[in-house]
Regions:
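Charged, amphipathic alpha-helical segments and their flanking helix caps
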Residues: 1-35, 47-148
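A short glycine-rich, His/Asp/Glu-containing loop-to-beta-strand
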Residues: 39-45
C-alpha cells in the first residue's frame, strides 16, 4: 500500500492530466530549480509538509500541505492565463481529493512572473490543506515465524 502523501500526489497528477486544459503540459514528479523554455508548460504536485496531531490513543489527524505549481511562457498576459489556470486547478484538486473522502481547501495562491529571453514566464503556486483522520503508524506484526 502506498503512503498517503504518495497517493495524494498521484491522484492529483492523474486528475490534472485528464483535464483538456493541461493536455500539452509536462507533469513533473520532481520540481527542479530551473526549467528551460523548451520544456514549458509544466505542472508539478508536491507535498512538502505534513503535521500529525494525536486526537486519541487510536486516532491521529494528518494535515498535509499539497502544492500545485504551474509554469508557462507567454506574453504580457501570462498572469491572466495563470489566473484562468488556477480556477480549473482548484476545481480539479477539490474534486479529486474530496472525491476520495479527504478534507481539502485552498489556502493560498501566488503568481510570479519574470522574463526569460524575449518571453515572459509565469509561475503559479497553489497551496491546499488536506486533512486525513487515521490510526497512528505501526510496525508490521512480526510475531509470525519466518521460513529460511
Amino acid at each position: 500500500m502506498a503512503h498517503f502523501r504518495s497517493e495524494y500526489r498521484a491522484l492529483v497528477r492523474a486528475a490534472l492530466r485528464e483535464h483538456a486544459r493541461f493536455a500539452d503540459f509536462t507533469i513533473l514528479k520532481v520540481w527542479p530549480g530551473s526549467i528551460d523554455a523548451a520544456t514549458l508548460p509544466v505542472l508539478g504536485v508536491l507535498t512538502p509538509q505534513d503535521r500529525c496531531e494525536q486526537e486519541t490513543m487510536t486516532s491521529t489527524s494528518r494535515r498535509t500541505l499539497l502544492q500545485v505549481a504551474a509554469r508557462r511562457a507567454g506574453h504580457d498576459e501570462v498572469e491572466d492565463v495563470l489566473d484562468a489556470d488556477s480556477e480549473i486547478i482548484e476545481a480539479v484538486v477539490n474534486a479529486a481529493i474530496r472525491g476520495a473522502g479527504i478534507s481539502c481547501f485552498l489556502d493560498e495562491t501566488s503568481v510570479v512572473s519574470n522574463t526569460l529571453g524575449e518571453r515572459h514566464v509565469g509561475t503559479l503556486v497553489m497551496t491546499f490543506r488536506l486533512t486525513l483522520w487515521c490510526a497512528p503508524a505501526t510496525l508490521p506484526d512480526d510475531t509470525e515465524p519466518t521460513t529460511p
